[in-house]
Swiss-Prot record:
Keywords: Cytoplasm, Lipoprotein, Myristate. It comes from Gallus gallus. A lipid is attached at residue 2 (N-myristoyl glycine). It is found in: Cytoplasm, Cytosol. This is Paladin.
Length: 868
C-alpha cells in the first residue's frame, strides 16, 4: 500500500471542513483554504472509511489498493486573511498580520542617485575616506553599485546591511524588488525590536515560505502594495511560481562573492533609535578583523571600501558610515584628528554635561570628541547626527507640560528622541576611545569586554539625563511637583520617635555606629544630646546624610519633592558631587521663600495648603547645631536607593571615616537616609567593615546549620556571588566577614525584617508572582540590584584587606578599575542573574550593566528641568 501526498489545492467550504474534522464553525477572519478534501470526491464512489489522526487525514480506498495521505502543513486551517480597507481586496497576511509593502518609493531618493548609481541616496564620506552609504537597492540596482565601485578602482569591498527588519525581494518584470512586512496601523513603519533570539535571516526564510504557500492557494499570485499614499489600483499582484521567485537578503547580497572574490557581505542589524548594543559593536569589529587590509597599515595596499545600507540610507546608514570612517581614520594613523570637510555652518554649541564629563575624565578626551565631531561632519550630507540632538532638544524645550498626542506626552516623546540621539553620539565617542586603545593592539579585547574594563563609561551614560539639576521652585508653586512629609512613607517600625524624636534610631552592638531616619532640626538636637550625654560621652560625631533626593525643612517638618501621581516614590537627582545637590536645595529654598504662596503639601494622612515661614536646607539644619555640639562634623554623601553604592560613594564614605578616625579614634558615626532602612543599613555595614579593619576583625563563629526553605540562597550562595568569590583571594573568607557584618547590623533592626542579604531571594520570589508585568519588572530589577549590592560589599571588604598595607591610598574606585576589572569582575556583573533558579535570557537588558545602571538612575521620570 503506497502513500503519496495530494497536491490539489482548493478552497474548502465550511460544511466540507466540518464533515471531515468534526468541528464547529470558524472565525470569519480565518481562511478555510487547506489541501482540499474535496479531492476525496474522486474516490467517493469507492471509499470505505476516512481515518484521521493528528498528522493528516488518511483515505483508505476500495479493497485497500490505494492510500492518499493529505498533508496540511501549509495552513493547518488557520492562515489569517485581512484587508487594508473595506474598499480593498482581502488576502492572506504574512505572520498572521502583516502586509507586504514596497520598500522604496521615488520621493525617498533625495540625492536622485537610483538611475545613475543603482541605489537611492548613494554617497561617499568626505575627506577622502572609502566609506559609502546608500538606501535599499533592488537586485539589479545592487549589481550597478558594485560595478560603480569597481570602475572607481576599489578592488576590495566589505558591504554591511544594517537593517534589523526582514526584507524580501519579489520578481517584478526583469528585476527583484524589495518589499517589507508592515502592520495595518502604520504602513510606513518597518518591523523593529524583533523578539530577542530571533534571527532576522530565519524570519525572512519563514516569510518566503509563507508567500510561496499563499501563492499556491491563490492561483500562483500574491498581493503586495506599491502605493500606500493614494492606494491607486492596490493591491498589486506578483506572480510566484516557486520559491526561486522570492529572494531573501542573504541571497541578494552574498551571491556576488562567487564573481568578486574580494567582496565580503555581513548583516549587522542596527537599531533605528539609540546606540547599538555592545554585541553589535563586537560583531562589527569581528567582521573587520577578517580583512587584513584594515588591520595592517600597508601603504602599498589600500584598505577595502566600506559600504553600508539601510532602507532610506539616512539614520542607520549614517551611524554605520561614522563607525566605518572612524576605523579608516585610525587605519591612516596620521593627523590627531581628521580635517573638517567644510567650515562649520553655525557657531559652536555648548556641550552636553555628559560629554563635558567624558572630556574631563578621559586622557585625550577633548581630542576624541573632536575626532568624532569631524567624522560626523564628514558623513553629514544626508543627516547630521550631532545637529539632530540639538534639534530634538529645541523641540523639547518648546513643548508645554500638558500637550498630548494620542494620549501620550509629546514632551516625553521628544525627551526620549533627544536622549536616544545623545546616547548614539556618546557611544560613537566611546567607540573612538576603544579604537585609540585597541586598534594598535589588533583589537585584543572585544568592545563589550573593553567596556567592562571602563565601568566609568557606564556610570556616565546612566546619568545622561541630568535635567533634575535645573529644576526651580516654580515646579512647586505651580503644583507640577508637590512636597510630601517624610513620615507619610517612612513608618517608625522601631518605635523610637517617643524617646529619640526620630524614627528607627538604632546602634550596632558594641560599636559607635548608629543609623536613623531623617531628623528635623529639633530631632537632631535630641539625638546629639543623647550621643554626648554622660553615658555615651561621644566628643566627636561624624553625621552622614545619604539622601540623593532634594530635602527641605519647612515649618519644622522635613519634606521631599515628588510627582503628584507617584507620591510614594522618591526622585533621585543624578549628581556627580554632593555640592551640586546642596546647591540645588539652596536654590529651591530661596524660590519658595520668595514666592510666599500657599503650597499644596502632603502630611502623614492628609493634604493641606501651607505657607512656609521658615525653610532650611539639610546643610543649614546641621550648621545650627555646630555651636552647641562643637565635635559635630556633617557630610552629605548621596548614595542610590535599593542598589549598590557607586564606586566613588565607597571612596567618599571611607575617606570621611579615615579623616574622622585620624582626629579621634573614638568618633561616633551616624548615618541617615529617608527611613533609616536600605541606604542607612548599607552604610552601617560599610562602616562596620571599615572599623573592623582599623580595630581588628572579630573571630568568626561556627557556621550555623540553617534548616529553612531556600537556606542556600538565604545565606547568599548564589551562583553569580560564588563566581566572584572564586575570583577573589581568600574569597570565601571575604564573603563570610561581610555576612558577619550584615548579621551584626541586622540584630539592631529585627522588627524591620530587613536584611541586606536575605532580601535578595525574598524579592526574587515576589517578582516571580507579581500581579502584572510592570510590578514583575520592578521586582526583577530590585532583586538584581540587591544581588549587586551584596557583591559590592564583598568586593569592598576584599579591597580593605588587599590595600590595607598602603593605608588605602588607592581609592576603591581606582582599585576596581585597575585590579578588579582586569580580573573580570565587571564581566560577571554584566551578566547578573539567577541561573540556578531560571532559564536566563542572555540579552535581557536588566542583566547588563548598561540597562541596570540606567534603570536605577531615575530614568522614567517626567522631564521637569532642562537637558544641560
Amino acid at each position: 500500500m503506497g502513500t503519496t501526498a495530494s497536491t490539489a489545492q482548493q478552497t474548502v467550504s465550511a460544511s466540507a471542513f466540518e464533515s471531515v474534522h468534526g468541528i464547529g464553525t470558524m472565525e470569519d477572519q480565518r481562511s478555510l483554504s487547506i489541501h482540499s478534501f474535496q479531492t476525496l470526491g474522486l474516490h467517493n464512489s469507492k471509499a470505505k472509511s476516512i481515518i484521521t489522526n493528528k498528522v493528516a487525514p488518511v483515505v483508505i480506498t476500495y479493497n485497500c489498493r490505494e492510500e492518499f495521505q493529505i498533508h496540511d502543513d501549509l495552513l493547518k486551517a488557520n492562515y489569517t486573511v485581512g484587508r487594508i480597507s473595506d474598499a480593498t481586496l482581502e488576502h492572506y497576511l504574512v505572520q498572521g498580520k502583516y502586509f507586504m509593502v514596497r520598500d522604496v518609493y521615488s520621493k525617498l531618493d533625495v540625492l536622485n542617485t537610483t538611475a545613475s548609481c543603482g541605489a537611492p541616496n548613494f554617497r561617499q564620506a568626505k575627506g577622502g575616506y572609502a566609506v559609502f552609504g546608500m538606501g535599499q537597492p533592488s537586485l539589479g540596482g545592487f549589481k550597478l553599485v558594485l560595478q560603480k565601485l569597481q570602475r572607481e578602482g576599489h578592488k576590495e569591498c566589505v558591504f554591511f546591511c544594517v537593517r534589523e527588519e526582514p526584507v524580501l525581494f519579489l520578481r517584478v518584470e526583469s528585476d527583484f524588488v524589495p518589499y517589507t512586512p508592515r502592520g495595518k496601523e502604520n504602513l510606513h513603519e518597518n518591523l523593529h525590536s524583533l523578539r530577542r533570539g530571533l534571527r532576522v535571516e530565519d524570519l525572512e526564510l519563514t516569510i518566503r515560505k509563507e508567500i510561496h504557500d499563499f501563492a499556491q492557494l491563490s492561483e500562483g499570485v500574491y498581493y503586495v502594495y506599491n502605493d500606500i499614499e493614494r492606494f491607486r489600483d492596490e493591491p498589486h499582484t506578483v506572480r510566484v511560481q516557486g520559491e526561486e521567485d522570492i529572494h531573501v537578503t542573504e541571497e541578494v547580497y552574498r551571491r556576488p562573492i562567487f564573481l568578486l572574490p574580494t567582496y565580503r557581505y555581513h548583516r549587522l542589524p542596527l537599531p533605528v533609535d539609540g546606540a547599538p548594543l555592545e554585541e553589535q559593536f563586537d560583531a562589527f569589529i569581528c567582521f573587520l578583523r577578517e580583512s587584513s587590509g584594515l588591520l595592517l597599515r600597508d601603504p602599498s595596499r589600500p584598505p577595502p571600501a566600506l559600504l553600508f545600507s539601510c532602507q532610506t540610507g539616512v539614520g542607520r546608514t549614517n551611524l554605520a558610515m561614522a563607525l566605518g570612517t572612524l576605523i579608516l581614520h585610525h587605519h591612516r594613523g596620521a593627523a590627531p584628528k581628521p580635517d573638517p570637510p567644510h567650515p562649520a555652518k553655525m557657531p559652536p554649541r555648548a556641550r552636553f554635561r555628559v560629554i563635558q564629563s567624558f572630556i574631563e575624565m578621559v586622557p585625550k578626551g577633548q581630542q576624541m570628541v573632536e575626532e568624532v565631531d569631524s567624522v560626523i561632519a564628514s558623513c553629514s550630507e544626508m543627516h547630521d547626527m550631532k545637529e539632530a540632538i540639538y534639534e530634538s532638544k529645541k523641540k523639547l524645550e518648546g513643548i508645554g507640560e500638558d500637550y498630548q498626542i494620542q494620549g501620550n506626552s509629546t514632551k516625553e516623546y521628544f525627551l526620549q528622541r533627544t536622549l536616544q540621539s545623545l546616547e548614539r553620539y556618546f557611544y560613537l565617542i566611546a567607540f573612538n576611545y576603544y579604537l585609540h586603545e585597541q586598534y594598535p593592539l589588533g583589537f585584543a579585547l572585544s568592545f563589550s569586554r573593553w567596556m567592562c574594563r571602563h565601568p566609568e563609561l557606564y556610570r556616565l551614560q546612566a546619568i545622561m539625563n541630568s535635567s533634575e539639576l535645573t529644576i526651580t521652585g516654580d515646579l512647586i508653586t505651580k503644583g507640577t511637583r508637590v512636597l510630601v512629609v517624610d513620615e507619610r512613607f517612612c513608618p517608625d517600625v522601631l518605635s523610637t520617635v517617643k524617646e529619640m524624636s526620630v524614627a528607627n534610631f538604632r546602634r550596632v552592638p558594641k560599636m559607635p555606629i548608629y543609623g536613623t531616619a531623617q531628623p528635623s532640626s529639633k530631632a537632631l538636637g535630641s539625638v546629639l544630646r543623647y550621643l554626648t550625654d554622660a553615658k555615651r560621652k561621644h566628643s566627636r560625631i561624624l553625621w552622614v546624610s545619604l539622601r540623593e533626593e532634594v530635602v527641605l525643612e519647612g515649618n519644622e517638618q522635613i519634606y521631599t519633592l515628588r510627582e503628584p501621581g507617584s507620591l510614594d516614590q522618591l526622585i533621585p537627582v543624578p549628581v556627580s558631587t554632593p555640592e551640586q545637590l546642596e546647591k540645588l536645595e539652596s536654590t529651591l529654598k530661596g524660590d519658595l521663600l520668595k514666592s510666599q504662596k500657599w503650597l499644596e503639601v502632603y502630611l502623614e494622612a492628609e493634604k493641606q495648603m501651607k505657607m512656609f515661614k521658615s525653610c532650611l536646607t539639610t546643610q543649614e539644619i546641621f550648621n545650627q547645631h555646630k555651636s552647641t555640639c562643637q565635635g559635630l562634623t556633617y557630610r552629605r554623601i548621596p548614595i542610590p536607593d535599593f542598589c549598590a553604592p557607586k564606586e566613588q560613594d565607597f571612596d567618599r564614605l571611607l575617606e570621611a571615616m579615615k579623616s574622622a578616625l585620624a582626629e579621634d579614634s573614638q568618633t561616633a558615626f551616624v548615618f541617615n537616609c529617608a527611613s533609616g532602612r536600605g541606604r542607612t543599613t548599607t552604610a552601617m555595614v560599610i562602616a562596620v567593615l571599615t572599623l573592623w579593619h582599623f580595630n581588628g576583625i572579630p573571630e568568626m563563629s561556627e557556621e550555623e546549620i540553617v534548616s529553612v526553605p531556600d537556606a542556600k540562597y538565604t545565606k547568599g550562595e548564589f551562583e553569580v556571588v560564588m563566581k566572584v568569590v572564586q575570583l577573589l583571594p581568600d574569597g570565601h573568607r571575604m564573603k563570610k566577614e561581610v555576612d558577619m557584618a550584615l548579621d551584626t547590623v541586622s540584630e539592631t533592626m529585627t522588627p524591620m525584617h530587613y536584611h541586606l542579604r536575605e532580601i535578595i531571594i525574598c524579592t526574587y520570589r515576589q517578582g516571580r508572582s507579581g500581579k502584572d508585568e510592570q510590578e514583575r519588572r520592578l521586582l526583577r530589577l530590585r532583586s538584581l540590584q540587591y544581588l549587586e549590592r551584596y557583591i559590592y560589599l564583598i568586593l569592598f571588604n576584599s579591597y580593605l584587606h588587599l590595600e590595607k598595607k598602603d593605608s588605602w591610598q588607592r581609592p576603591f574606585s581606582l582599585w576596581m578599575r585597575e585590579v578588579a576589572a582586569v580580573a573580570g569582575v565587571y564581566e560577571v556583573l554584566d551578566g547578573l542573574g539567577f541561573p540556578e533558579l531560571e532559564q536566563l535570557e542572555d540579552e535581557e537588558p536588566l542583566r547588563k550593566l548598561r540597562g541596570r545602571w540606567r534603570a536605577q538612575s531615575g530614568a522614567g521620570w517626567p522631564s521637569r528641568g532642562d537637558l544641560v
